[in-house]
Regions:
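Loop/helix patches that line or flank the sugar-binding groove of alpha-linked glycan CAZymes
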Residues: 2-3, 12-14, 28, 34-176
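Beta-strand-rich binding/interaction modules
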Residues: 174-195
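C-terminal beta-strand-rich structural cap/linker in extracellular carbohydrate-active enzymes
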Residues: 198-217
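Metal-dependent DNA phosphodiester-chemistry modules and their immediately adjacent helices/loops
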Residues: 9
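A residue-level signal for conserved active-site and pocket-lining positions in enzyme catalytic cores
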Residues: 24, 124, 210
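Aromatic- and acid-rich polysaccharide-binding/catalytic face
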Residues: 17-27
């Protein structure tokens, strides 16, 4: 976490950083993550809550696969809009090796699946459009950052009096964290996060593997 903080602070503050998980010249995110959809979801949640202007390479939002070593065309395979029998928009210029009917659920099916990676992108993009602090705000860190378990990625986004606290559990373990910041309410979560008040000044937050919670302060 401290490495990330140092990296962000090294960037110019008079320009907007462009953030991404992958592009057309790299292996697709889900392939780099060994096909682990939970890791791809937390990566998306992080991308859409950190500062900067996020760039989403087409197909990331439905978990498309692709490895550049097999050729550039295989990280640029056709987008799966719907089941192939009814997909009039799917291009035919290549027979895909990675993003096929058996490996990637088409968009029309993911729209109706509350646990799909598409719904993660949809949720966090809506949050960015709802909370100006996520889209435009400064990104800062708790003063006691080093005291937190390294399983957690914790930061604040703040803009025009609006302040959010974002906590990501980036590990494969369920972990609990105590926070003393004055919580107004939970804005959103990913992964069935639970929290309870310990006393008037602190809360206990239990986070499943690769989960996220956003608090309004």
């Amino acid at each position: 976490m401290t490495e990330m903080e140092a990296s962000f602070r090294s960037y110019r503050n008079d320009a907007t950083n462009v953030t991404k998980l992958s592009n057309h010249d790299e292996d697709r995110t889900l392939s780099r993550l060994g096909g682990d959809i939970s890791k791809a979801k937390i990566a998306a949640a992080i991308l859409l809550t950190i500062s900067g202007s996020p760039y989403i390479y087409y197909g990331e939002e439905i978990g498309m696969l692709g490895m550049k070593a097999s050729g550039d065309e295989n990280v640029r395979e056709p987008f799966l809009w719907s089941s192939i029998q009814s997909d009039k928009y799917r291009t035919k210029w290549i027979n895909p090796l990675f993003s096929t009917e058996s490996s990637v659920k088409p968009l029309d099916l993911q729209r109706n699946d509350k646990n799909s990676i598409f719904r993660v992108y949809e949720k966090f993009l809506k949050l960015r459009n709802t909370y100006q602090s996520l889209a435009l705000g400064d990104m800062t860190y708790p003063a006691n950052l080093d005291s937190y378990d390294k399983n957690f990625m914790i930061f604040f986004r703040e803009y025009a009096g609006e302040k959010l606290m974002i906590i990501h559990n980036v590990s494969s373990n369920t972990s609990t964290i105590a926070i003393s910041d004055p919580i107004v309410r939970a804005v959103a979560d990913m992964g069935s996060v639970t929290y309870s008040k310990i006393n008037t000044q602190s809360h206990s937050v239990t986070m499943p593997p690769y989960s996220t919670i956003i608090f309004e302060l």
